[in-house]
């Protein structure tokens, strides 16, 4: 490595807010299934605290060794609905508390997997888990929940969509930040290192390490050097920058997996912002020539960014996965917040942007009087985009306060302006229930 590359790396870390957002250990809990819920909870606690005992220490050692911040260490587990279904319990609070206690004792930032996969219907454990979510998130510190309500192969479970509209409202009432730790997915992935939607898929190995990187500031700085150049140059610049970022992510993942004695899973090629100035995806889009995010051209700029990040990342690492694209969470991105406050960015434009990027309506505050049917309809719209376009989409919305308020969540979750919601009703549409069938192009066998 020549001195120029060394200098570039130092600048990425010190000036451009580059970091490894998360090292996430995925742990299978299938061998913790028990007909007695207390025994199952004890097994879950034991397995997590054994497998991930050294996760935080190893992460800190690697960060010190490489001089690269590793912001979060996290754990994801098998969807708890699968574990709880073997019991006769009427709620899964004790399992959520076992997850939380394990997370607190090993020192990780979050634990994901209080989850259910209901894209084609409910099993016993799914319904119980979903009804447990509001209190599970209110009575724990570090547990994150997710529910997959649709897939390209299965269509959209509209009964579950209606239920989740209500559950999000109940969760927001039960605790201050509970709804910020709850994601509703279509086409959820099994190897996602990012919260709040991470869970460990049943097709995964017993224990794996997945890595998520963060580098919007690095990309913006690179684009500053090619102002006025053509889109070809723009795409190539993003691609080369994503290559560098992903290479570091792969190195960290391999080091962590070797030291922890578990398999290396994937690097998630997502550009994840933080509330810090200089670490914003919105500012990357504006650097491409937009006056402010939300104006015409925003969706095209995001499409270029997303695609170039994937192309560069795939070249850098032979194991990519997770969500892999640009994240556009409103509360976690100072540029997005400014665009909302400036009147340029609204829910409808964000929905259009989600047809391009890797998540969906993410970390968005809406008025607390928003009806649960309207929230369910937002979920249905996002799920439809994902199901038809064969991609992951998600909704993480927080019904709190009234339009124009600022809601502070703290830490990486940031601050969100409460956004206007279309006042017209979707209640009769949501009340139908049942299943929206899978699209014709899903029928490939």
From Swiss-Prot:
Gene3D superfamilies xrefs: 3.20.70.20
Source superkingdom: Bacteria
Record CDD domains: RNR_PFL_like_DUF711
InterPro entries: UPF0210
Record-linked Pfam families: DUF711
Family: Belongs to the UPF0210 family.
NCBIfam families cross-referenced by the UniProt entry: PRK05313.1
Subunit structure: Homodimer.
Name of the featured protein: UPF0210 protein SEQ_0468
Top-level taxonomy: Bacteria, Bacillati, Bacillota, Bacilli, Lactobacillales
